[in-house]
Amino acid sequence: MKGTGKRKKLRTALFIAAGAAAGLAIWFGIPYSPLRDGFGKDIKRITADSRYHTDGGIITEEAIGHLPEAVKKCIRHCGFIGTPVMSYMKMGFHDVAFSMGKDKPTLNIDYTLYDFTAEPCRMAFIDSSMFGVPFQGYDYYENGSGGMKGVLAKAFTVVNETGSSMDKACLVTYLSESMCAPSILLRNDITFEETDEHNVRAEMTYAGQTADGVFTFNDEYEMISFTSDDRRTETDADGNEHFIPWTVKCGGYKAAENGVLLPAKMQIVWNYPDGDLVYFDGEVGSIVYG
């Protein structure tokens, strides 16, 4: 009788374990997640908010007249003159090689970002998995406050970074993407210094934070890189923040459906003293303006 009882308990335990495993498989497999749902609701809310709508019109020579010559040449070469002043840009990447850091694993991720132009605002969503377990991330910047959240198994928050350094990092990331959404460049809170015919330093001040970096252009005046010292790479055990150069690289410019030239490839790099770490390496799947 005792043996029969033990077997029943074992069968019950196995049944419960199998049910839990099946439940997890279903939970992991469905598209829904609380973080993704929050991202979608934020995008819907922001796109409906009139503060984030431009006044319309088109990008003209007169509108870009105050910009440095290299920036004007970039806007002209890429075909933005005569196109609508966009309220936002949506950029999508698929199967990006994403490094978790030095001597850490590399994941394949899907990445979707929105840059809004009437007010500095950036939202981005990471979708990936680690050993079959969903891993998702959400980068957000709105009203001068930014953060980064990472969630494992759609339920457990493993990264949740906020603070002034994150605010500044989000602002400089927003600035780095402005050549692909040139309505941003028409704002009066960005100043420029043309250091030579192929390099322009840009400084943006918003909500009490200032971030800057250098845009570099090739001979065709396609933007090929943006480098800044305003991104924190780590905080040590004593609470000291460490900053090293951070670079966005663009290339492979192609004509989009609306005729403008846009980069097809993008890398994001930490320029460590002992060598570069390319932590984001992917091809641009789509760019949509609204």
Regions found by a protein language model. Name each.
Residues 2-21:
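N-terminal Sec-pathway targeting helices
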Residues 21-47, 220-236, 290:
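Membrane-interacting alpha-helical segments
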Residues 26-111:
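N-terminal cleavable signal peptides for secretion/export
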Residues 72-156:
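N-terminal mature ectodomain segment of secretory-pathway/periplasmic proteins
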Residues 86-90, 117-125, 194-203, 224-225, ...:
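Short, hydrophobic/aromatic-rich segments at coil-to-beta transitions
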Residues 111-117, 138-140, 188-195, 214-216, ...:
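Short, exposed beta-strand/loop patches in secreted or surface proteins that constitute
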Residues 149-208:
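Flexible, processing/modification-adjacent segments and terminal tails
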Residues 202-289:
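Gly/Pro-enriched, hydrophobic low-complexity segments
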